[in-house]
Each structure stands twice: as C-alpha cells, then as structure tokens.
Amino acid sequence: MKNIVVCIGNGLLSEAIIKMLKNSGEFQPFRVLIQKNSNIANDCEALSADILLLDVSYASGTTMETRLKEVKQVREKIPTCKLVMLCDENSAPDIAREVVNAKKDGLIDAFFYSSVTEKYLTAALASL
C-alpha cells in the first residue's frame, strides 16, 4: 500500500479524491491543508509519502510558482517521493501548459488533467 499525500485547495475535490484513493485499496491517503506557514516537505517526510498529489490553479497557495517551490523542497528532502500535479486543462489552459513543461523539464514525475476518470487516475497513480 502506498502512502499518498493529497494537497488540494478545493475541499470537495480533495475529499472526493481521498475517498476514491481509500476505496481503491491501494493507497493510504493523507490530506494536507494549504496553510500560510505550512511545509509540505516536512509533512511528506513525517507521513513517509510515496506520492505527493498537488493541484495547480490560480487560487492562492496553489499557483504554479508556489507548487514548484514545494516540489523542489520535497524532492530535496525525499528524493524517492513521486511528485504529481493535477490541473484543469479546460478552465486554465495556460496552467496546463506550464504543468506539461514541468513534466518535460523533469521537475515532476507525472501530471493529470482533472477531466480523467477516477479509474484511470487510481491506476496511473498505482503504477508510479
């Protein structure tokens, strides 16, 4: 079973993803709240995260700039943790392009659009 830290700004989406991951039987999900002085790298280390799933949006705390700083810190602290970004390719195509570029540049291990099915998302995460 993989430990997955879920850091998603939208509470409803976060809860739905956590429920989906729990129900798959392949993950032990942990929700990390977005707070001004939080340190996701420390949280991931404390929770022995195998995967960190982050959303990227225009909202404060979830911007691409913020998320790239966070993934850099996690990569330095826990090099084996897989870094995964989730974004909405329809409402934020510019963010989606930035996320694709982050993957191309090796800054993250994978990305998903929020339009994917839950079956695909769980299967792809399990394969990391």
Predicted features along the sequence, with ranges:
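Acidic, metal-coordinating helix/loop segments flanking the phosphotransfer/catalytic sites
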Residues: 34-51, 61
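Structural beta-sheet core signal
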Residues: 6, 84-85
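Non-catalytic signal-transmission and effector/linker regions of two-component phosphorelay proteins
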Residues: 1-5, 9-20, 117-128
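Output/docking surface of receiver
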Residues: 87-127
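Two-component/phosphorelay signaling modules centered on CheY-like receiver
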Residues: 11-37
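Conserved phosphotransfer cores of two-component systems
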Residues: 45-47, 74-80
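Two-component signal transduction core modules
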Residues: 52, 83, 110-111
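Conserved phosphotransfer microenvironments
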Residues: 52-77, 90, 95-98
